[in-house]
Each structure stands twice: as structure tokens, then as C-alpha cells.
Amino acid sequence: ANMIANNFVTEKVDMIYAIATSTAQAAAQSTDKIPVVFSAITDPEAAGILKKNVTGISDRVNVKQQLELLLKLDSKIKKIGVIYNSSEQNSKVQVDDLKKAASELGITIVEKSVTQVSEIPQASETLVKESDALYLPTDNLVASVVNLITEKAIKAKKIAFGAESAHVKGGALITQGVDYYEMGKEAGKIAIDILKNGKNPSEITFKKM
């Protein structure tokens, strides 16, 4: 990512569009002058990318609203399992948000952190046994095998709640979260403001979907 970002700077591009935390960090570190528009970052501030030439769209969701919707489906839910990649900053932020929201609603979070796909089957098996429902965060590792996780939830007759619309396509029962296609369109509008309308990124506060 750093090499690509530096190449863009060398080529003197008009703008850099960065998707996800690591690529946005590389872009932000590579230049103070070229506008950088990001998307699919949960916590831009913690990622250290908020500079005068950087703006974009965050995918951080209202987890408490999500849990409230889940409880409307089944008010008996007391334990929610979550599996996530502990090496992914976005995922750790989401799990922290999940714990905070759960404590406010009297729910216990059962978490399993993984760092590679091969760990997910066993972690999923454990979670469906120890929890009443599963919460799927917007996590790249989880997304790569979401069908595997939801199949185990369905087999155990447990609800799988997705934090993004793609999770439902992967077998989750319900979602109230991010549509990354729409996020891309919103990022495109910011790009137009900068490239066509002459706005400075510092004039455009980053926003959430």
C-alpha cells in the first residue's frame, strides 16, 4: 500500500481514493498536498489519518440500535457471540462499541478473536454453543467465510445478525448496517466536491453512513 501511494504522489495524481484503514494510512502518510478521500474506515481518528488534506466516509455504525433490533426479534437473548480478527483495527473498535452497548442493555458478550481463516470454524462452533445469537462485524476475515459462520448458526437455530448488508446475502438472518455500494457513491460525491467544485478537504468534515 505504501509503494502504491508513493507512486501516486510521484505521478502527481489529482486525488487519491483509499478504501479501508491500511490503504488510507498509507495514502495519508504519503502526502500533505494531494487530496485523499477514504471510505470503509471505522475510526479515522484512531487510525491517525485526519489531516487537512484527508476526508471521507466512516462505516462506524450505531451498535446499540442494532442490538435493540436484535432484541425485538428475540427478547430472551442474554448472550451474544462475536468473532473478529484481532489484528484488524476496525474490528477491535466495533467489538469495543459492542461491549459498551451490550452492558447498557444487560447483555453479555462472548468474544472469540482470530487472526487467520483456519481458526474460524472452531471459534464459530464454540460461539454457537456458548451464546444465544451471533453478531457479525464488518471484518474482512469474517466476510471471507461468512457463509461458514452463518451455516453453523442456522444449524444451531441461533440468529446471526450482520453489521452490513452483504452478511444477509451470506446467510445472516437480518442486518441494520452499512451498504458499501452506497458508501462508495457518497465518497464519489465528496470527490466531485473536491475535483469539480474546488472544495478543500479541510472544508469537508468526514461523516458516517
Language-model region placement:
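Short hydrophobic alpha-helices and adjacent helix-cap/hinge residues
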Residues: 1-209
